[in-house]
Structures are given as structure tokens and as C-alpha cells.
């Protein structure tokens, strides 16, 4: 089926979203045009508003409409803990755990092959934040991928001479998981990171 230039433009625009391929973009575009034009207008307005008004928190670098995000603006948070994450979605995920410390959001992970070194992801800013704060512990919560592990190792090495404790989130068998279904790498991490049972 051949689409008009405007429909083709809409389909191409929708394809920039993660996980949206050609067929999904076509279905979305046709749905908006045939069944939900008012929803399409709301989507366009919300997208425009967000792109114009959402920036980055000046302290932790997560997405925020204000100079300080809600977590950084909250005086009740624990100023002794700093959790380092790879992106804003990680802040949301960790917030669901009840964590009450502060955050620092990297711009991804180290990837020399892609030209992403320490400066590109914000390591100098992280070091400045640690030096300026009263943090006792830096919790590295990068993804358990090769790049995430390399980033965590680099941060830990860089902070080794500071007065803060550097820790890494645990990796391993998920709660409710069955060992026979867990991959070897995950199980290996779980065994290496074992801890005593508190009675």
C-alpha cells in the first residue's frame, strides 16, 4: 500500500520511538487518523509541551520541569547516600524500592567503540558532586551488562581515593525465581555475591 506524503511523514516520525518498527508505526498512524484524531492532537500537544519545558535537574541531571527535580528539592531525603544510575528511567525504578537518598544520572555507560568516554557520560560532574556533597556512600546502580560493569568499575576506581564508601547493587537470582531457569551468568554473579543469613 502506498501512503500519501503526510501519512508517510507521520509513520517515519513514529518509528523513532524505541521498539516501534514499520508495521507498528503504520498501525499507530492509521489508528490516530481513522479512530482517534482528538487523541492524536492531545499527543502532539503533550509532546510539544514536554519538549519545550522539560530539561535536566541541575543537581542530579534527571529529567525535570524545574531547576531541581522533586527528589533533589526534597529536604527530607538522606544526604549521606548517592545512587549513580545510567538514565532517568533508572531513577524511577529505584524510587519504587523506597530508596530515600540522592541521585546522580549518567548519560549512559562507557563505550569507547561508540566514542563515549568518561566526559561524555558525566564522570567529571559526578566527581564534583561527590566532592561538594556530604556523602558517606556512593551506590553504583549501572546495568548488569558488560558496559555497565565497566562503568561501575571505572567509577569505583576513580572514587577509591575519596572518603566515601563505594558499593554496587547486588545482582543475581530474582525473588521467586527457579534456579533451573536462571542463566549461567546470573547464577555465577549470585554465587559470587552471596552473603551470610542473618538470624
Curated annotation (Swiss-Prot):
Q: Which GO terms describe its molecular function?
A: DNA binding; zinc ion binding
Tell me, what is an example of a GO biological process annotation in this record? DNA recombination
ZnF (C4-type) spans are 57-72
Question: Of which family is this protein a member?
Answer: Belongs to the RecR family.
Pfam families linked: RecR_C, RecR_HhH, RecR_ZnF, Toprim_4
Q: Which InterPro entries match?
A: DNA_Rcmb_RecR, Rcmb_RecR, Rcmb_RecR_Znf, TOPRIM_dom, TOPRIM_RecR
Q: Which UniProt keywords apply?
A: DNA damage, DNA recombination, DNA repair, Metal-binding, Zinc, Zinc-finger
Functional note = May play a role in DNA repair. It seems to be involved in an RecBC-independent recombinational process of DNA repair. It may act with RecF and RecO.
User: Where does the source fall among the domains of life?
Assistant: Bacteria
**Know the name of this protein?**
Recombination protein RecR
Q: Where is the Toprim domain?
A: 80-174
Annotated HAMAP family: RecR (MF_00017)
Record's SMART domains?
TOPRIM
Gene (UniProt): recR
Amino acid at each position: 500500500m502506498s501512503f500519501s506524503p503526510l501519512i508517510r511523514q507521520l509513520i517515519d516520525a513514529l518509528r523513532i520511538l524505541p521498539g516501534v518498527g514499520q508495521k507498528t508505526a503504520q498501525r499507530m498512524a492509521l489508528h490516530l487518523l481513522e479512530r482517534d484524531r482528538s487523541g492524536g492532537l492531545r499527543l502532539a500537544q503533550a509532546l510539544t509541551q514536554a519538549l519545550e519545558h522539560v530539561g535536566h535537574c541541575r543537581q542530579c541531571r534527571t529529567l525535570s520541569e524545574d531547576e531541581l527535580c522533586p527528589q533533589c528539592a526534597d529536604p527530607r531525603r538522606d544526604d549521606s547516600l548517592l545512587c549513580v544510575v545510567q538514565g532517568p528511567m533508572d531513577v524511577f525504578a529505584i524510587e519504587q524500592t523506597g530508596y530515600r537518598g540522592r541521585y546522580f544520572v549518567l548519560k549512559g555507560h562507557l563505550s569507547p567503540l561508540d566514542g563515549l568516554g568518561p566526559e561524555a557520560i558525566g564522570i567529571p560532574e559526578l566527581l564534583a558532586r561527590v566532592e561538594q556533597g556530604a556523602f558517606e556512600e556512593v551506590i553504583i546502580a549501572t546495568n548488569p551488562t558488560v558496559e555497565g560493569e565497566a562503568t561501575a568499575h571505572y567509577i569505583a576506581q576513580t572514587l577509591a581515593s575519596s572518603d566515601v564508601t563505594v558499593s554496587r547493587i547486588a545482582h543475581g537470582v530474582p525473588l521467586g525465581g527457579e534456579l533451573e531457569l536462571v542463566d549461567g551468568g546470573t547464577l555465577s554473579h549470585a554465587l559470587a555475591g552471596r552473603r551470610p543469613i542473618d538470624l
